[in-house]
């Protein structure tokens, strides 16, 4: 597995923060780092396989990656990321206690993926741009300024994440997308889902299309197909069983949609013919 090293990304040995844009981010094989990072998805879509679990990421997704986490990107479509790298929560010169603002693992569950709405994403961009402008400066005031900006970024993300902000339709749509990640195999009635998240059906369609480029049903089908592809690669379950587990009642229909989406049949993926398992 590829290991990315801090010496290749941080501007100096004393720098506690570095900015690494990926505009766009192409498919990238599984890797880990000797540093931590916050991945901010600017726009586009893709699959982020994080410690073996696939997540659909779109504009407004924020991923917290620790040094020991392994992850990869696949099936990217104009996916643009900004990575905010930091050595460790306890490797800042002027800040202490940052770990309390980061996601915490509890009973083996690590909430690695958050979402923020478009207006918050704009504020995030401004903070990141300020950090990036100061990367060439190594004096103490500049170092302190970058670390303060990093603290402001963490505070903004924490206050604005799904867990704490449901006051507008954009935030409720983000919550809906997170709900779909857990309930993709359920039978989804879009009228009922819109009511559940206090959205009109028209608003749901419009905002989801704006954020993902897909209609709600197309997004759900793609999510199901992504989950199915992951199971085909990493489980011994039959194609029929995987189809049912991922929300498809007809395995033939599943195979047709799968080939249309990936240009490979489920059997091709199972046998590694797409090159993923080579």
Swiss-Prot record:
| One Pfam family per UniProt | HTH_18
Among NCBIfam families, the record links this protein to: PRK13503.1
Q: Which domain of life is it from?
A: Bacteria
Q: Name one GO molecular function term.
A: sequence-specific DNA binding
Task: Return the annotated DNA-binding positions.
Answer: 191-212, 239-262
Q: Subunit details for this protein?
A: Binds DNA as a dimer.
Q: Which PANTHER family is this protein grouped with?
A: HTH-TYPE TRANSCRIPTIONAL ACTIVATOR RHAS, HTH-TYPE TRANSCRIPTIONAL ACTIVATOR RHAS-RELATED
Q: Spell out the protein name for this chain.
A: HTH-type transcriptional activator RhaS
HAMAP family to which the protein is assigned, alphabetical: HTH_type_RhaS (MF_01534)
**GO BP term, example:** rhamnose metabolic process
Q: Where is this site: Interaction with sigma-70?
A: 241, 250
* Keyword Transcription among UniProt keywords: yes
Assigned keywords, A-Z:
Activator, Cytoplasm, DNA-binding, Repeat, Rhamnose metabolism, Transcription, Transcription regulation
Any one cellular component term from GO for this entry? cytoplasm
């Amino acid at each position: 597995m590829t290991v990315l090293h801090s010496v290749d990304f941080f501007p100096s040995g004393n720098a506690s923060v570095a900015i690494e844009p990926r505009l766009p981010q192409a498919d990238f094989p599984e890797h880990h780092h000797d540093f931590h990072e916050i991945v901010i998805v600017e726009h586009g879509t893709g699959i982020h396989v994080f410690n073996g679990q696939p997540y659909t990421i779109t504009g407004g997704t924020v991923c917290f990656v620790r040094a020991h986490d392994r992850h990869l990107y696949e099936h990217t479509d104009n996916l643009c990321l900004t990575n905010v790298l930091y050595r460790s929560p306890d490797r800042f010169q002027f800040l202490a206690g940052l770990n309390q603002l980061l996601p915490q693992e509890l009973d083996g569950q690590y909430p690695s993926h958050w979402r923020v709405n478009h207006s918050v994403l704009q504020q995030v961009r401004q903070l990141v741009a300020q950090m990036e402008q100061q990367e060439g400066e190594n004096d103490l005031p500049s170092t302190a300024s970058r670390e303060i900006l990093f603290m402001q970024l963490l505070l903004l993300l924490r206050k604005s994440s799904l867990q704490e902000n449901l006051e507008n339709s954009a935030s409720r749509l983000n919550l809906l997308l997170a709900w779909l990640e857990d309930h993709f195999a359920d039978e989804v009635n879009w009228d009922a889902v819109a009511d559940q998240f206090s959205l009109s059906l028209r608003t749901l369609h419009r905002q989801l299309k704006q954020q993902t480029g897909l209609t709600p049903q197309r997004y759900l089908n793609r999510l199901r197909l992504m989950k199915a592809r992951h199971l085909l690669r990493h489980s011994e379950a039959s194609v029929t069983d995987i189809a049912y587990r991922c929300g498809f009642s007809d395995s033939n229909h599943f195979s047709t949609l799968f080939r249309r989406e990936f240009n490979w049949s489920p059997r091709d993926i199972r046998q590694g013919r797409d090159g993923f398992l080579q």
